[in-house]
Amino acid sequence: MFSTTMGFPSTPLEAKQALGISSGISSVSSGLRSGSPMLSASYEPQLSFARCVEQWKGKEIARWIEGLGDQMNPYLGMIRDNIKSGKQLEALDDDSLKKIGISALGARKTIFQAVSLLLYFCHESEHENLQRLAQQVKTSCLYVERTMTSAMRMREKAIRRSEIVNILNSVSNAVLQLAEHTKRFVFWLDRTPFDEEPEFINVRNSVSSFMWNLLRNVNVQPKALFETGSQIVRMSKELAYECQKIVDCDDPLILYACFIESALLRRRSDNINWGLNIQSSYRGVHVISEIKEGSPADACTKIDAGDEILMINGRTVVGWDLTSVVQQVGALDVLELSLIVKRRPREPQLPKQSKLAARALAPSSQTAKTYSTDDYDPFGQSEPLKRHRSCHVISEIIKENERKIRISRRLIRRSSIASACPRKERKNIDERALDGDDEDDWDVHEFIRNVDGEEEALVPRIAKRTRTMRHQPDGYVRSFIDNKLVTDIEDDVVNDQLTFNVKCPNEFAQIKEVDKEELKVLNLPEARVSDEDWKAPYQEFAAPSFRAVGDSNISGFSLDSPRLLPVSSRMTSSVEESAFGVLPSPSTSSMNSVSSPAPFGKFQMSTSQTEWSPNPDDLPGSPISAAYAGMEKLFEGWVRRRKTRAELNANELTNKWPKIWMCLRGHYLLLYTNQNTKRPEMVINLIKATISDSTDLKTSKKNIFRITAAPLDYHFSCFTALDWRNWTQKMKMAKEIFANAGTQPRIMSQSVSSYNNDLSDQNFFLGQQTGSGLSTLPRVTTNGMTTSKSGGLGGGGFKQK
């Protein structure tokens, strides 16, 4: 009764007999273990998964069934007492589960699916290759074609409802079996070494397209199914034709099969993550989708992206859900992790072939043969002698080259095959500095002779180790990679993001609001604003910006209000070049918008053409208190804050990472529910806190920084890496400036912003503070405005009247 759930036959015994579907494949002999590391008929794998399952007892079977879900807990005792050997799983069916006492239909269905998948890995998985899978899909297409044709004939004669139901069930069973075989076939094409070959990529796309169209025509009402019967037959023929291309392909890659291998991961401490990403391709099959570089998983050379996990520390995880597998890996406080994986197909190890034997020697060589079958011409022009190095000199060169190779460092990951091809090496930096006369790392064999085209063809193709799969999943993925950011950015990337390097487009898109009457004509509902981020009043104002003459491309500073951005900076989403700015909203818009509950004031222009500054009294209002009333906002934007333990205990069903509006005002960090709130829900004094960009928090969030204000720790997550860098940089700078100021007034943010034009001059600026005090001191006038005096910073400073 479960033949239509996963594409397997009704019983596991019929599953073994179903292998006769692809008995027409005669190109691969039973003794040729193509997926093994050696092409030998006498090769025996080191680990047999089928033998391991056959030796199971009742306790091992109950432990495996326990991982299928919590709904299996009431039946564990029944399974342990009645199924006492792993061999009994091959004869397990729905009736035997009923006799045991498992009355729930859902529990029997889950157990039967897991057992069928387990037997598949025990028997069929070791013999699979791409040609065999393509033949199975082709055979299933012919079966669908024959079943649909007979169903269309029987529909004309069927009178009773039960007869029509039997016809529909036969068609559904045939299509579902085809879908299951196609799923495995596409899963193979998504992994190396097939994901980089254009021929296999084209076949993969065509097969997926045909299968999706076929399923759309089948998943219809019963009356419409027979109307589209001719289309189903046509698409089945096209799908079979695409699979025939793989069967007739002369590439030896289609004969390579997977094999089972054990891997052991080690780490120095519990704080180090394993560096694995695990995804479920379909229920019960767990695949390593990504391996982080430098992690314990990367150090182990026996696992790659695309390998399927069968056992974790002696426990079989085939058929489990992804959550149980994640708990099995993440909850282990051990320094070693043992995995049994089904490796992806790889290149076999071929015997080394001597290239010197196939190369002809020069006639004048001393090692050449002393006789010749050609006619001797005493007056012919003889070939000049070639001077060779002595054996002593060659041996010295070989020893020197081997010494350099031993001290050199490996450039790429080791290849997945054990072939005769050498891996790339690079010289040590220190050794290169010492040996100035020899800059290239060359091989003595390549110096003596060159490799021709025929010898190039003898070199086997290498399938390099991969850390990521070609098709990343769109759904549920559990990550074991730690949240550490990469701060190294190339100079070219930074220069491309600067506002004055962006070319203005010639054509612009024009956006107009549609009238209500036109919406009625188009029969469209009136739009409603449901996003809380855009309910605040929206107003945009551009102020002129100033950049000192002679500064570099990175040293431009802006005298605009912290809530306002220059026109050029709003053309991109980057605020790196601006000393202070507003982070863009996390919505889909890429414009740097400004939303404030208060209207914008007017700017006052000084008498000098190079001096522009906003009036602090006319700046947009914001919730303030007595402690930071005179401080100007330095930075603000949307972030996510992780709730504290007390907040999570108060309400269990809550969002752990709510989105908040955060504002940096002086050395105070103000947290609001949104930008329209008048009072902050939390205020953090950065002088008494510790700002850290490294955290041991286990979460899938990225771009995390931590603020420790005893006795609490606050974790924040930014939406982009650029926001993370801006927040951490400006908070640390504000903390350093106000901490060194000591007894100076707190209203010095206006003068601080003037010296933030160049981030490279921060060390110089902070050094002047400790030596002779601040170079610029604020002065408060009677009208409340803040002015500053130039302290001799050259072109980087400015005067304000």
Swiss-Prot record:
One of its GO terms (cellular component) is membrane. Residues 351-376, 776-801 are annotated as: Disordered. Keywords: Cytoplasm, Membrane. Pfam families: CRIC_ras_sig (PF10534), PDZ (PF00595), PH (PF00169), SAM_1 (PF00536). Signal peptide: none annotated. The keyword Cytoplasm applies. Coiled coil: none annotated. It is found in: Cytoplasm; Membrane. Residues 632-736 form the PH domain. Residues 129-225 form the CRIC domain. This is Connector enhancer of kinase suppressor of ras. It comes from Caenorhabditis elegans.
